[in-house]
Amino acid sequence: MKKLFIILLIGFLNINLFAQDFPFPPELKWWIFEIQSIDKNVKIENFKFSEKRSILNQDAPISYKNRLYPVLKKWNYFGNEFAYYDIYASLEKNKSGKYSISGEPDTAFGIFDKNEILLFVDFFGSSKGIDSFCWVRDNRIIAVGRDIINSYEDGLSDIDFIIYDYYIKNGGEIIVKEYTYNIKSVNMAKLKLRWVEQRSDYFENN
């Protein structure tokens, strides 16, 4: 009986080790709703833990003073740091008065101090990136994005939808946990997952 109890306890601990432990902000629920337009079964609790990694502080300070766009910044509550959608992104104003956003095939999510000094950067390849993000505490960010696993000639793709949990530790390190939900044969043209696609009042999307 005691042995059975220990086995059950270990199993319970293993299950909870990979359970979600992140606070998903209501500001990002639109992203879940967008995915539900192609898969009604998707829920936050369906995302499974897939990876834990760390990002170290930049070895040398890099200033981006006067090179960043305010609309791409989100400040933490204390106001001493901000996260930046993509440090490679640029904005162009169109004749309509709205903006188009462009950048490199690869993207980079950055965290800066109030003087626009780059503290941390998370690099993504051309198939992977962040759609939107939100501070939930002064030292914690929840971000959402996707990774294109396979692309097919008919225009469909197998996608890992990803929730990122960024925890900024004292001592110059960020712990990143990733939670994924896979959907096969997705027509990405039917989805508006990037936050700029939700702001038709400000942006024009190609």
What do the PLM-derived regions correspond to, one by one?
Residues 55-66, 115-128, 175-180:
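Multi-bladed beta-propeller domains
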Residues 69-71, 105, 129-131:
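Beta-rich catalytic cores
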Residues 85-103, 147-163:
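Short, conserved, GDST-rich strand-edge loop motifs in beta-rich repeat architectures
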Residues 21, 147-206:
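Acidic, small-residue rich beta-repeat scaffolds with periodic aromatic anchors
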Residues 99-115, 158-171:
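Beta-propeller blade signature
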Residues 73-82, 133-139, 204:
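Blade-terminus and WD-like Trp-Asp/Gly-His loop motifs, strongest in beta-propeller folds
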Residues 4-15:
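Sec-dependent N-terminal signal peptides
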Residues 19-95:
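Terminal domain-start segments
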